[in-house]
């Protein structure tokens, strides 16, 4: 059996989201460009179901992960005269996590054990790309390790590739890996939930047409219903804009009103967003991504963040 015919690599790992498309781009012209790096098993420009007008983004699916890597290692990509932004497609489940679609070079690693050292993290994560910095967080007073770390890479695709993997094992223990948001992103998220309640800006920083009236970009507002922090609270990843400063100060503030305390429970009031089917931004069967304002999905309530699943889940029980 040829590698391209092998079913062993999940489709989600072989799929790329392509943002910033020209409204003139068709399935055929998108395919013509990206098939230079391998065999495409699927290629689609997402369109408004009523007007059939392009929504400015699409998806391509390769036969192998190796072909995806080859495409991502080639930049820039220009389709129909316009520079586009390919990123590894995010699954529906993962899209509900704050910051799931932001472009960052740093990951948060939670649930690591006290005997985990920097070289253990490096040995595992360097398979995904060049590591610039590893920070294992400790308590300022006691010096005790707090059960989480940050790893910074030289390229955002390394982070995207890591977070779409469901399981990561460091020194024999499963750990939780998520994107780490820069302070300015957290501040934008916090301010967005106080100031913007429109149809939703997907990043807001670059202005490329993403879909309908939405904007696709790298910084700022993800949704008009309250940004990352939910529609009611102080908002943002760090609660009232504290961001990751909370890690080094008093309570390990990670999410609006939540905490990650010494190998323990992660509590968060963050809202969930991004309904997708199999990473298809709503999919062809479940409706357009963002159509009718459907940026939020029902929280999953699947237990704690990392080590314990005894108390609250990642996502509060609110439905938007």
UniProtKB/Swiss-Prot annotation:
Region: RNA-binding RGG-box, residue numbers: 218-240
Ranges for region Globular B domain: 95-185
CDD domains assigned to the protein according to its UniProt record, in alphabetical order: RRM1_hnRNPA1
Segments of skewed composition (Gly residues): 198-216, 276-294
GO CC list: catalytic step 2 spliceosome; cytoplasm
Omega-N-methylarginine sites (modified residues): 194, 206, 218, 225, 284
Residues recorded with modification Phosphoserine: 6, 22
Region of interest: Globular A domain: 4-94
Keyword Nucleus attributed: yes
Record domain RRM: where: 14-97, 105-184
Region (Disordered): 181-216, 271-320
Full protein name: Heterogeneous nuclear ribonucleoprotein A1-like 2
The species this protein was found in: Homo sapiens (Human)
Organism classification: Eukaryota, Metazoa, Chordata, Craniata, Vertebrata
């Amino acid at each position: 059996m040829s590698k391209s015919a092998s079913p062993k690599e999940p489709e989600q790992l072989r799929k790329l989201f392509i943002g910033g498309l020209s409204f003139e781009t068709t399935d055929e012209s998108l395919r013509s460009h990206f098939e230079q790096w391998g065999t495409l098993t699927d290629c689609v420009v997402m369109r408004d179901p009523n007007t059939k007008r392009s929504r400015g983004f699409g998806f391509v699916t390769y036969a192998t992960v190796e072909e995806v890597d080859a495409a991502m290692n080639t930049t820039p990509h220009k389709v129909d005269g316009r520079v586009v932004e390919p990123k590894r497609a995010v699954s529906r489940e993962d899209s509900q996590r704050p910051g799931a679609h932001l472009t960052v070079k740093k990951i948060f690693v939670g649930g690591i054990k006290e005997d985990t050292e920097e070289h253990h993290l490096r040995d595992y994560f360097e398979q995904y790309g060049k590591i610039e910095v590893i920070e294992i967080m400790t308590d300022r007073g006691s010096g005790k390790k707090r059960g989480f770390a940050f790893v910074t890479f030289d390229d955002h695709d390394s982070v995207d590739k890591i977070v779409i993997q469901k399981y990561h094992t460091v020194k024999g223990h499963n750990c939780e890996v998520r994107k780490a948001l820069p302070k300015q992103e957290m501040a934008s998220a916090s301010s967005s939930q106080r100031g913007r309640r429109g149809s939703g800006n997907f990043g807001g920083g670059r202005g490329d047409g993403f879909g309908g009236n939405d904007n696709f970009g790298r910084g700022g507002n993800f949704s008009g219903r309250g940004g990352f922090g939910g529609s009611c609270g102080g908002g943002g990843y760090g609660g009232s804009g504290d961001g990751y400063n909370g890690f080094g100060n008093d309570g390990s503030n990670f999410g609006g009103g939540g905490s990650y305390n010494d190998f323990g429970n992660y509590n968060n009031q963050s809202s969930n967003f991004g309904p997708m089917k199999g990473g298809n931004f709503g999919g062809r069967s479940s409706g357009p991504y963002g159509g009718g304002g459907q940026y939020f999905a029902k929280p999953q309530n699947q237990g704690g963040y990392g080590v314990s699943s005894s108390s609250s889940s990642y996502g509060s029980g609110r439905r938007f």
